[in-house]
Each structure stands twice: as C-alpha cells, then as structure tokens.
Amino acid sequence: MNKGSRDNNHSDRGISVVLAGGGTAGHVEPAMAVADALRALDPDVRITALGTQRGLETRLVPQRGYDLELITPVPLPRKPSKDLLRLPMRVRTAIRQTRDVLTGVNADVVVGFGGYVALPAYLAARGGLTGRRKVPVVVHEANARAGLANRVGARSARRVLSAVPDSGLRNVEVVGVPVRESITSLDRAALRAQARAEFGFAEDARVLLVFGGSQGAQSINRAVSAAAKDLAAAGISVLHAHGPKNTLDLPPADPQAPPYVAVPYLDRMDLAYAAADLAICRSGAMTVAEVTAVGLPAIYVPLPIGNGEQRLNALPVVDAGGGLLVDDADLSGDTVARTVIPLLTDDSKLAAMTAAASLSGHPDAARRVAQVALEIARAARKKAS
C-alpha cells in the first residue's frame, strides 16, 4: 500500500490520541480525566494510554475502559548509580517501543503528563512514526515545578498547558489539573445529607475529613488521632482514611461523643467530600485540584521530600484564602486542635474559606486539555491531507 492510500484511510478514521501519563496516580488520573473528556467531545476518538507494567495504569486504565500499551519503564535516577549507566539503553528501548505503538495506532497527537512514560513518548513523537510523519505533542504539567520529562517535551511541543503560571516552562497556558467528571460535577450541598448518613454522622455535624493519599500519611495519622479527644470535646466528627497498611492509636470510643470514623481507604471520595466541612491532607497536585474543584477548604501538610513542589502546589489556594499551610515538622495533636477547632466552630470564617476554595479550582481543566488535543490533531491531519 502506498503512502497516499495510507493517509486516505487514516483521514477516514477517528482521531487517534495517545495519552502518556503512567506511573503514579498523579499522572494516571489526569490522563483518564482527559480521556473521558475526549470521548465526550468526540465519540469517534480513538484513545490509547501508554504505561509500564509497574505503574497504577495497569489497573486504572482497563477499569476505565481504555486501551493500554506497555513500554519499558525509564525511571530517572536522582543520584549517580548503576541505573544511570543503564539509562541510555533503556531510553532507546522505550523510544523504539513507543514509536511502534504510535505507528500501530496511527497517532494524530500525543498528550503527555510527565513522568517516566512521557519522556520516551515525547522523543518518539519528535522522531516520527516508522517511515512517516512526526506526531505533534501537547504537554500538561500538573505540578508547580516541572519535572525533567516535561521540560524536555515542552521544547518541541505545539502547546504547553499547566496548572499554574510559574511552573518553570515557557509559553504556558494555565488550565488547571484535569479532574474526573464525578468530582467536578459534585454538588456537595445536595449530597450532604446522604453522604453524612452513609458514614454515620448527624446531618448538622461539623465534619473533618482526613486523608493522605492512597497509602495514607503517618505523620498526619499520628497528629489527628492524638487530637481525637479535643476534637470530640469541641463537637467535631472525623472521617479519617488512614491507609491500608496503617493503624490509628485512638482513645476508646465514647457513644456520647461525635463519631470518629476510621477507614483504611475511601472508595467514594465524592461522598467523603460531600460529608466534610474541612479537610486535612497532603498537597499533591491531584489532591489540591480535587479539593478546590469541590470547594472544600483544607489544611495542607506538604510532603517533606522532593523539590518542594507540594508546598508550591498549595500556595495559590492558601494565598487566595481557601486553605492553610502547616509544615509536616510542626504537625502534632496540639497543632491540629489549635487549627481545626477555631475553623470548624466559626461559621463566617469557614464560609469565607469555602468560597475562596471554590474560586481557586479549575473544574473545566479536563475539557480544556481535550479541546486543545483535538484542535492540534485536526490541524495536523488537515496539513497532511
């Protein structure tokens, strides 16, 4: 078959989008939110997720009904090691595998979300399909400080999208972090009574939601459980997702006190958000995006590792009045009690924080990223025809 006939067949098929966002939930969830938005905008779109065998995408992508193609992982060592010596070979292998995927699905555009899946995708797209055209790239950076993969991808990308204006990338368009539609469409007030009944709280309760990501956060767990008596004495109920591998040291339950509901994991974050008046959580990009999308004020406790991006992720919300920052090193039972109780017992202050949190969110981020991807893909097809 000659090149011209291949291109004609290509133009008759739905737009082919490859999403490169494997590894952690912070990369996979935005990719899946964009996939859902793409399908809503164009039911004929063909979506392929790129991932590795070791990432969460092996479970999350099939659950959401999308095709998944696996490549060799290319983790980038932070320090000199044997892995650094193996890096060039791994990169070449991953690029070759990715180019095969892009060719196999006849990709029209690659949308990358950073991490060790995105880097080979950017390089393969720039090199072009086997014997054919280059593939345009759209980069999305969720963190306030861009990682290596997105810094590389942004150099040749058609469009660079970001959660914040100062992520370290040039010529960015601020769109926020893509969040799944079940969260962005959540009406907390309408669902509150059902949500509180689900967890055993009174309809008029003051509810603190505590979570530290899918695996929990031990420092948050220790501090909030140490404040349990003070919170109960102030009439505050607690919904605490402590992580499947963690336990809490709680005082004996008092049937006369507001309930302290401790669970390993929350399958229904929508109900948890609807039940809550205030949250204590980490400040990963995805967490901040979800919490602000639903308009929930929060006390953010940045993870004290990495390059400080979690603190930067929360700063815009905190500066706008939608949250507070507490350093992990300063977290204790006393800190929790002194911070939470004045907030949850002051209606006007809580209402102001709730309003500010709502204004800080970007509930249309997934749709905006999807629109850009389709625009770039259609322009590339038109140019090639």
From Swiss-Prot:
Gene Ontology CC entries for this record: plasma membrane
Q: What is its EC number?
A: 2.4.1.227
Which pathway does UniProt place it in?
Answer: Cell wall biogenesis; peptidoglycan biosynthesis
A Gene Ontology annotation in the biological process aspect, one of them, is: cell division
Q: Which reaction does it catalyse?
A: di-trans,octa-cis-undecaprenyl diphospho-N-acetyl-alpha-D-muramoyl-L-alanyl-D-glutamyl-meso-2,6-diaminopimeloyl-D-alanyl-D-alanine + UDP-N-acetyl-alpha-D-glucosamine = di-trans,octa-cis-undecaprenyl diphospho-[N-acetyl-alpha-D-glucosaminyl-(1->4)]-N-acetyl-alpha-D-muramoyl-L-alanyl-D-glutamyl-meso-2,6-diaminopimeloyl-D-alanyl-D-alanine + UDP + H(+)
Q: Which CDD domains does the annotation name? A: GT28_MurG
Entry coiled-coil feature ranges:
none
Name the chain's protein. UDP-N-acetylglucosamine--N-acetylmuramyl-(pentapeptide) pyrophosphoryl-undecaprenol N-acetylglucosamine transferase
State the organism of origin: Mycolicibacterium smegmatis (strain ATCC 700084 / mc(2)155) (Mycobacterium smegmatis)
